[in-house]
């Protein structure tokens, strides 16, 4: 059948400057991606360049990809209560590397709450894909202005 490729919809006009960059993924141990994919679509539709790491993403993968690609936000997704603690590792690594002023950590997913976000020291909680995109745009615009 020849080469198979995935066509991506044109979410933002060509030549348009992106609002900023986000590193997105589902945390280590979690193979669920429907929610993450919805977040990616909403973010791309809002003019954000998204680096989608897929599922089962380690803290090191999140942070190194964010640094290499100059992402202002790391957005972590989790569907399972057994994997939500991995988000704490992402926050911890961002702080260990002294990146907390350049990279903000956003968390979301079915078992995640504002209370959990506060407990692990993440910067932002998004209750759904639309909220994640809106919050990311705000964060990135502030970063771009400073």
Language-model segment annotations:
Residues 135-146:
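C-terminal helical cap(s) of enzyme catalytic domains, especially alpha/beta-barrels
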Residues 11-27:
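Glycine/charge-rich, flexible interdomain linkers and switch-proximal surface loops
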Residues 36-46, 51-122, 131, 135-137:
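Cofactor-cradling patches in redox/metallo enzymes
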Residues 125-126:
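A structural signal for hydrophobic residues in beta-strands of small regulatory alpha/beta folds
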Residues 1-5:
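Short, small-residue-biased leader/transition segments that mark boundaries at the very start
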């Amino acid at each position: 059948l020849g080469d198979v490729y995935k066509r991506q919809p044109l979410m933002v006009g060509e030549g348009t400057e992106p609002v900023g960059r986000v590193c997105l993924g589902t945390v280590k141990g979690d193979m669920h991606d429907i929610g993450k994919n919805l977040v990616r679509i909403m973010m791309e539709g809002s003019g954000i360049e998204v680096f989608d790491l897929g599922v089962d993403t380690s803290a090191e993968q999140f942070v190194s990809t964010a640094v290499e690609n100059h992402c202002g936000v790391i957005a972590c997704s989790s569907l399972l209560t057994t994997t939500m603690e991995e988000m704490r590792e992402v926050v911890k690594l961002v702080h260990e590397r002294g990146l907390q002023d350049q990279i903000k950590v956003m968390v979301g997913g079915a078992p995640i709450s504002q209370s959990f976000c506060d407990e692990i020291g993440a910067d932002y909680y998004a209750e759904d894909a639309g909220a994640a995109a809106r919050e990311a745009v705000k964060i990135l615009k502030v970063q771009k202005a400073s």
